Amino acid sequence: MTDDGPYGPHLWDEPEEEAIRYEDLPTPASPEKKRVDAWTIVLGLFGGVLLGTGVTLAVLGFTGVFEEPTPPTNPPPPSLTLPPPTSSPPVVVESGNATEVAQRAIPSIVAVEVPSAFGLGGGSGVVYSPDGYIITNHHVVTGAEDTMVVFADGGRWAAEVIGSDPLTDIAVLRVARQDLTPIEIGSSAGLTIGERAVAVGNPLALEGGPSVTYGIVSAHNRTLEVQVGTTLYGLIQTDAPITRGSSGGALLDNDARLVGITTAIAVSDVGAEGLGFAIPIDMAIGVANDLIESGLVNHALLGIQGRTAFAQQDGAEYPVGVMVTDVSSPSAYEDAGGQVNDVITALDGAPIITMDTLLTQLRSRRAGESVTLAVTRSESSVDLAVTLGTQ
């Protein structure tokens, strides 16, 4: 962790040489360290919900700050045998405001409890299917041996970690319960900046059920280095308050449809607030389905090294695509006829203007999927049909 300086501690350290080939990583343009001024990116789970006497090094990797310890929680009371719950009809409401969105969503939001040697950690989760599958964050459950899920009706169930993916910070749990209310799945592709957003989670391990906050979609396609060597791509930024402990919760549109999984917040000592981040649901669902099917994620691999390409216009530089600096052999890109010095400008019609936008697109694709790349080669336009490889 870097020196505190005048604005408090930061997360970003000097970048190390990338030795991992699971991703098409950009070639660094300069040795400058990657940081965002006075901001610290905080993955919301353990940063504020560890109720013990210390914080592990793994937690520091996610938060970049030490948290003030609070007394450990009391152990849960002994289990009681309860009569079967009576079923109640689903809430029927119209779309249009945060109250209605909350009524639709709250039955599908859970608290995730992760005991540790340091106390009780926690986060949030979203019911994905009626037969017990729940989506949460990788950093919520990583290293967990025993995980419990608390539902909005008060039911507390043991959960199994089906699988977890650090590249997208998505994990899937399963409980032995067959009567769940799954969240309605929306699409992050159609989100527009300025439209309403509602965040639902379980902040600070507070009792009493999920918490609802309200704001707007502030930005698309944010890239955050949340710890050294771990970068999240394509994030949705929102000003709907997301407090620690809400990691793995829901970001909803105005029709109570799930458009993101809340994952990180930015905090600062200089007064600016309101930066929360969510994994787009179009990316999260593909990862979750892979985890449910096999426990592993079939991340797509193009097989190149590259960097953002710039063009001069009216005395200014503008990003125009990804310059291919190296092609692996064998690789999906080589098999499609790709060459060094190609400039990739689109993937299935979606503009590619920086390396980050290419990586964001690849995160949402699966190995074996066929895509079309628009490429500029020696001032000519070429379309490449690529079958994506696997990592």
Residue ranges and their predicted role:
Residues 289-296, 334-339, 345-351, 357-391:
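PDZ-domain C-terminal substructure recognizer with occasional recognition of PDZ-binding tails
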